[in-house]
Every structure is written in C-alpha cells, then in structure tokens.
C-alpha cells in the first residue's frame, strides 16, 4: 500500500496560525475603541451592543462601503496605514448625514495570502477611524482565499450601525427656498474617483512618489485619509437647525446633492466661493478632464454640504471653524421646477 501525503489547510494556502497571530496583534487597538454599550470582547460568534439609554425612540441606521480602487494605489505604493481610516470614514460619514451617532463597526478583510503586518496596519487604521468617529470596532472577518486574489492583494469592506432619535432624523424634508448651503472642506479626493486618478497617472506617465505638489509627494495628496466629520457634525446638529446634509462621494456634486433635495427645489452653487485644492487642479490638467466631469467624479474640495436657514449660517460657520473645519457659504436653495437639480455658476 502506497503512503499518501497527509495534506493540511496550510498546504492549501490557508494559514490559521497567521490568522491567530493577527488577532493577537490587533486586540490592543481594538480595545481602545470600546464604547460602554458594548458587551463582551473579540472572538464571540456575534457582537453584542446595547442602545444608549438617552434615546427615547431610537432608530437604527446602517451602512456599508469600501474604498474602491484607492486600495490598488495604496497596494502599489505599499502604504496601508490610512486605508482603514478611509474605510470607516466612508461608512460613518454616510450615517451622520441622517443625524445618526455611529455605535459599532465591523470589517471584512479578504486576501489571497495573509500578510500579518499588512493586515495589522489596515486594521489599526480602522481602529483609528473608529476612535475619530466615536464608534466601537466590535468584530470582523479575515478571509484568506488562495486562488481568489493575486498573491497578497487584499480587499476591504466596512459595515456600520448608528442610532438617531426618531424625531431628529435628518432627511431633507425641511429644505426650503432661501436655505443657505454651507461647505465643509475635504482632505483630498477622499475615496472616490480613483479609477480616473489611476488612469491619469498612467496616461501622463506620472510617478506619484517622485512628483511633488506643494512641497510634498503627489502620493501624499492622493492617499490622504478621508476626513471624518462625525463628531463635529453631531455637535452642529445640537446647536443649529440643520435641514439636510449631503456627503459628496461617488457621483460628486451632480449625483449626491439631489439625494437630499425635496421636489421643486434647486441647489445653486457659487463656484467663486472657494478654490480647489491643488490636487484637483493637478488631476484636471494632467488628465485634460472637463469641468463637468470633475464635478461628477470628485468632491473638488468639498466633503460635506449642509443646508440650513440663512439666519443660522454665520453661527454654523463659526462653530465649525472653531472645531477645525474649513467651512464657508457655498450656495443657496431656490424654489424651482427645473430638471436641473444642481446649478454651478
């Protein structure tokens, strides 16, 4: 009888020991994100979280997102430390526009071959994003799937749940003629438009690590982590009558602003109210990208757009400025039955 080789999971490309080593590496940073409502620690079959007692009629708000092909750029440049912040930001910023306070976050990390150092760097970034937004990292899934991804390439997805008082949900229904639009500045392209970014780099034959822009590598501008606005916006909501908030993500101005506008209203954006950050000017020039396409693909320096009564505008700008945001009046809401929901002039 011939002796057959005894195969193991590791022979098939799945290293359980590496997965366990990763869990040991991240326990400390995950613990720092813990909210008092969270029960139990990492390792359970499910994460338990009570609702904060201050809510009378709590409504749960959920969201999921990724970071798109910004991830490819980060892998090519071997810079993994801020991708986790991007992942959290894309989820929690979507929650806060409805007035929701993020409660907990889960991540999904999939790779062809688990590199513990890379994964730990990404998850440390996720924990940092959770700290910035005040939510707990309660669990996640690390999937090592040989044959599904090339080598140590990886993908990440995030899932977040928040809570808002039912009577305080922000849904855009209060937006009306005469409202003022306040902009909160972005940190860069955030996590959208990176397939176009990468195409521009390819066509222009630009090395983002050796090309300088405003005294630092272009790569620093392109990989700047997505700004997390949660804590500052929650404070704004407590002090100002906010009618609507739009998170400028994929689809830019043309797609995201109409999502919070009632029928028969139009957002009029004053293009002269701000200057695009240098990275957007570089992208437009290097890629010969039209103005319309820029506003459809990128945030062009505007991460959040907030609609509120004109009488509250100065107060809102002062409060956000005091909190470190770059805030300014960017436009107004007009009554209109036009099919053009957004006008930039």
From Swiss-Prot:
<keyword id="KW-0547">Nucleotide-binding</keyword>
<dbReference type="Pfam" id="PF00586">
    <property type="entry name" value="AIRS"/>
</dbReference>
<dbReference type="GO" id="GO:0005524">
    <property type="term" value="F:ATP binding"/>
</dbReference>
<dbReference type="InterPro" id="IPR010918">
    <property type="entry name" value="PurM-like_C_dom"/>
</dbReference>
<dbReference type="InterPro" id="IPR036676">
    <property type="entry name" value="PurM-like_C_sf"/>
</dbReference>
<comment type="similarity">
    <text>Belongs to the AIR synthase family.</text>
</comment>
<keyword id="KW-0963">Cytoplasm</keyword>
<dbReference type="GO" id="GO:0006189">
    <property type="term" value="P:'de novo' IMP biosynthetic process"/>
</dbReference>
<protein>
    <recommendedName>
        <fullName>Phosphoribosylformylglycinamidine cyclo-ligase</fullName>
        <ecNumber>6.3.3.1</ecNumber>
    </recommendedName>
</protein>
<dbReference type="InterPro" id="IPR004733">
    <property type="entry name" value="PurM_cligase"/>
</dbReference>
<dbReference type="GO" id="GO:0004641">
    <property type="term" value="F:phosphoribosylformylglycinamidine cyclo-ligase activity"/>
</dbReference>
<dbReference type="GO" id="GO:0004637">
    <property type="term" value="F:phosphoribosylamine-glycine ligase activity"/>
</dbReference>
<dbReference type="Pfam" id="PF02769">
    <property type="entry name" value="AIRS_C"/>
</dbReference>
<comment type="pathway">
    <text>Purine metabolism; IMP biosynthesis via de novo pathway; 5-amino-1-(5-phospho-D-ribosyl)imidazole from N(2)-formyl-N(1)-(5-phospho-D-ribosyl)glycinamide: step 2/2.</text>
</comment>
<dbReference type="InterPro" id="IPR036921">
    <property type="entry name" value="PurM-like_N_sf"/>
</dbReference>
<keyword id="KW-0067">ATP-binding</keyword>
<dbReference type="GO" id="GO:0046084">
    <property type="term" value="P:adenine biosynthetic process"/>
</dbReference>
<dbReference type="InterPro" id="IPR016188">
    <property type="entry name" value="PurM-like_N"/>
</dbReference>
<dbReference type="GO" id="GO:0005829">
    <property type="term" value="C:cytosol"/>
</dbReference>
<keyword id="KW-0436">Ligase</keyword>
<keyword id="KW-0658">Purine biosynthesis</keyword>
């Amino acid at each position: 009888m011939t002796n057959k080789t005894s195969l193991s999971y590791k022979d098939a490309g799945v290293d359980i020991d590496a997965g366990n080593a990763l869990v040991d590496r991240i326990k400390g940073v995950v613990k720092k994100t813990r909210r008092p409502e969270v029960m139990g620690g990492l390792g359970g079959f499910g994460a338990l979280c009570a609702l904060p007692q201050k809510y009378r009629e709590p409504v749960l708000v959920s969201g999921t997102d990724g970071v798109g092909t910004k991830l490819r750029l980060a892998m090519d440049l071997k810079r993994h430390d801020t991708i986790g912040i991007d992942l959290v930001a894309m989820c929690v910023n979507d929650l806060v526009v409805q007035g929701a306070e993020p409660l907990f976050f889960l991540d999904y990390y999939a790779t062809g071959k688990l590199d513990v150092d890379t994964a730990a760097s990404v998850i440390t970034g996720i924990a940092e994003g959770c700290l910035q937004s005040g939510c707990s990292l309660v669990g996640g899934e690390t999937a090592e799937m040989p044959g599904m991804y090339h080598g140590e390439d990886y993908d990440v997805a995030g899932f977040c749940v928040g809570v808002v008082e039912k009577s305080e949900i922000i849904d855009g229904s209060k937006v009306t003629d005469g409202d003022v639009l306040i902009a909160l500045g972005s940190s860069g392209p955030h996590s959208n438009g990176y397939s176009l970014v990468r195409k521009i780099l390819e066509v222009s034959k630009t090395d983002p690590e050796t090309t300088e822009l405003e005294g630092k590598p272009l790569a620093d501008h392109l990989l700047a982590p997505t700004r997390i606005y949660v804590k500052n916006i929650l404070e704004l909501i407590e002090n100002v009558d906010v009618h609507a908030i739009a998170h400028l993500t994929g689809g830019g101005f043309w797609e995201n602003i109409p999502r919070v506008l009632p029928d028969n209203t139009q957002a009029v954006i004053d293009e002269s109210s701000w200057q695009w950050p240098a990275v957007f000017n570089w992208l437009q020039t290097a890629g010969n990208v039209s103005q319309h396409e820029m506003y459809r693909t990128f945030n062009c320096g505007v991460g959040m757009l907030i609609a509120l009564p004109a009488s509250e505008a100065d107060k809102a700008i002062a409060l956000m400025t005091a909190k470190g945001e770059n805030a300014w009046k960017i436009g107004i809401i007009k009554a209109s039955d036009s099919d053009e929901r957004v006008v930039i002039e």
